[in-house]
From Swiss-Prot:
Keywords: Cytoplasm, Cytoplasmic vesicle, Golgi apparatus, Membrane, Phosphoprotein. The gene is TEPSIN. Changing residue 523 to A: Loss of interaction with AP4E1 in vitro. It is a peripheral membrane protein. Changing residue 524 to A: Decreased interaction with AP4E1 in vitro. Changing residue 518 to A: Loss of interaction with AP4E1 in vitro. One of its GO terms (molecular function) is protein-containing complex binding. The lineage of its organism: Eukaryota, Metazoa, Chordata, Craniata, Vertebrata. Changing residue 469 to A/P: No effect on interaction with AP4B1 in vitro. Changing residue 472 to D/P: No effect on interaction with AP4B1 in vitro. The modification Phosphoserine is found at residues 333, 356. It is found in: Golgi apparatus, trans-Golgi network membrane; Cytoplasmic vesicle; Cytoplasm, Cytosol. Changing residue 474 to A: Decreased interaction with AP4B1 in vitro. This is AP-4 complex accessory subunit Tepsin. Interacts with AP4B1 and AP4E1; the interaction is direct and mediates the association of TEPSIN with the adapter-like complex 4 (AP-4), a heterotetramer composed of AP4B1, AP4E1, AP4M1 and AP4S1.
Amino acid sequence: MAAAPPLRDRLSFLHRLPILLKGTSDDDVPCPGYLFEEIAKISHESPGSSQCLLEYLLSRLHSSSGHGKLKVLKILLYLCSHGSSFFLLILKRNSAFIQEAAAFAGPPDPLHGNSLYQKVRAAAQDLGSTLFSDTVLPLAPSQPLGTPPATGMGSQARPHSTLQGFGYSKEHGRTAVRHQPGQAGGGWDELDSGPSSQNSSQNSDLSRVSDSGSHSGSDSHSGASREPGDLAERVEVVALSDCQQELSLVRTVTRGPRAFLSREEAQHFIKACGLLNCEAVLQLLTCHLRGTSECTQLRALCAIASLGSSDLLPQEHILLRTRPWLQELSMGSPGPVTNKATKILRHFEASCGQLSPARGTSAEPGPTAALPGPSDLLTDAVPLPGSQVFLQPLSSTPVSSRSPAPSSGMPSSPVPTPPPDASPIPAPGDPSEAEARLAESRRWRPERIPGGTDSPKRGPSSCAWSRDSLFAGMELVACPRLVGAGAAAGESCPDAPRAPQTSSQRTAAKEPPGSEPSAFAFLNA
């Protein structure tokens, strides 16, 4: 800066310090409009006051938070058109602080994300373009303190103006008519057109600022919420020479002593990508997958995998941009790079629900790969030699009788034996033979009859109960009276073999042959 301001100007500046403290506070309360005019008056007092004012504003711009930086930048932008010429001169000499604010970044806010950083960067770029523009700024001469500038709708600060107010503003020189391709009625911008045509030039300036802000830093939440197809169609060609921060980040990630990224390196990489252009970082990483060393390729693959595990970019978009390079690496000679590329490619395809051409054209199963039959679950299980067989196939042996041993006076029914050609364990891998033996074993399987013994399956005419009953096969507990009566009946017939009879059997013997046996016959005894 220039020489130190005199002591008198410093003391005069101290009286205006509360105004500056209120206008540049570190909170989200916007600066009141009247403070802009009060601060502009300070710059018109004297060159020393302008120098003190600039020193204070630049110190606040350097040390304050995001809200304070944004307020200081708005005050400086207002002073570009309402401040003194000496203030603008010394502000141009200290433009390094404005360039530092143009690269302002930090960790995203949990609620607002990176919106505050983008506003600060856009305001700094707007201030720099206004301060160093080719057009001459409309600087008014230093006004005395006693005559403040006239403010209000339609008011003009002209000494000889007779009529003031809305509708009496003097028209300035002619304005060149420009051709607007998107306008209706021939596409010519007229002087008396509506607000849509008047705001076209302002929208173009705002679009330039927003585009530059999007190139310098992208919001992680907005990048993750885009549709993958829309990203593939609307992706802009990013000039790698304009992405110096992204290029330095990729160089730092791909150059390391180890072949894989540590957890700290991956976290630092994801945090840095949240403040930069993630699409440019992905494009630079894919450039390091070809023509580089094996260690560089592995670190680039790890960085791509870390980027895919975050929510900065959709996995469909990452797969669309990296699939050709990953497929080329996965088809190379076996090695760590090939394995890593194949693993990442399969992970992205599984996450996106897509299949690679190599996996999609699989060979059709031959006739030997037919679906196994229902008996193959156990017939195909062959025990190891020397091991105990716990589970045998269904068709190995017929179902044996599970009834308890009959008493001494109870004659047992003969159980048929299977034919002698039935082998205990069929040959594995022969489903037709297993099915045939399973059907044969079902034909010779004994079934339980209501009498309590097992007998071979007979036709419906030889069965005691031709119709299935709800309580068929259930043995009821006999009452003590019925048991005593049964014992007396047994003593009267000593020659008959004694066998335990249930109440259902006795009831069935008393009832006529045509009636259905009842499960509650003991209630009527």
